[in-house]
Amino acid sequence: MKNITNYYVEDKSKLISNKDAYIVGKKFRITVLSHRLVRIEYSEKGLFEDRPTSLIINRSFPKIDYFITESDSMIEINTGVFTLTYVKDSPIKSGILSSNIKAVINGTKKEWQINNPEVRNLRGINYSIDSVKDKIVLDKGLYSLDGFCLLDDSRSLVLDENDMFIERDKDIKDLYLFMYDNDFEGCLSDYFTLTGYPSMIPRYALGAWWYKNNNYKEEEIKEVKENKEVKNEI
């Protein structure tokens, strides 16, 4: 019987990014995954995560060129699509008036900061409105009219060496920043590269005919089966 790791992670080697994608400090690690996507980690202990999480199973993206400008206290990363600026080894947390980390989409005024409320986010979806009487509050989605979205993976469970999902250190930050401007297709492609595509059930499992929730009687089901030449195993 296969363990969870072998079932969940197709290729363990893809959990590690290209070595040229890393910019590492004492308490931070920034990984440039694509021209539109960067991973930002912060840990007081200087410990960074390479194991799969309940959301992320692939951090191996094609190598890209990017440019770094840095001083003793600051680092600036330009991917060609956006520019990220960070005060080295400073805590990454929301709720502060002047952010120590920010990113700007090149050639625009679209700026992200850690405390950005992302009010122009187009939100996600709701699966059902059954028995709903109050206003539905949708979760944040990938797409935003601002052209950026922050995915916080800090609280996701980690799949450890014992094949168990465990909680992470509460003092760490593990963020994925999508800076795509109007390239929505590229954003979605990066997301599915990161998380894997959703599994699809076989087409035959969806059934052999469509109906409007009619209450079929046994004889009617037999008639449909004969008319549609439905196989017994289906």
Model feature map: region roles:
Residues 220-234:
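Catalytic domains of carbohydrate-active enzymes, especially glycoside hydrolases
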Residues 14-17, 22-24, 60-62, 69-71, ...:
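Residues that act as N-cap/strand-start positions at coil-to-secondary-structure junctions
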Residues 17-19, 26-28, 65, 137-139, ...:
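Generic recognition of flexible, low-complexity loop/linker segments
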Residues 10, 14-29, 33-39:
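N-terminal-proximal low-complexity accessory segments that begin disordered
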Residues 67-213, 221-222:
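Catalytic and substrate-binding clefts that recognize carbohydrates or anionic sugar/phosphate headgroups
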Residues 2-3, 8-9, 33-72:
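A low-complexity, Ser/Thr/Gly/Pro-enriched, surface-exposed linker/loop concept
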Residues 1-5, 10-13, 47-50, 56-57, ...:
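N-terminal start-of-chain detector that recognizes signal peptides
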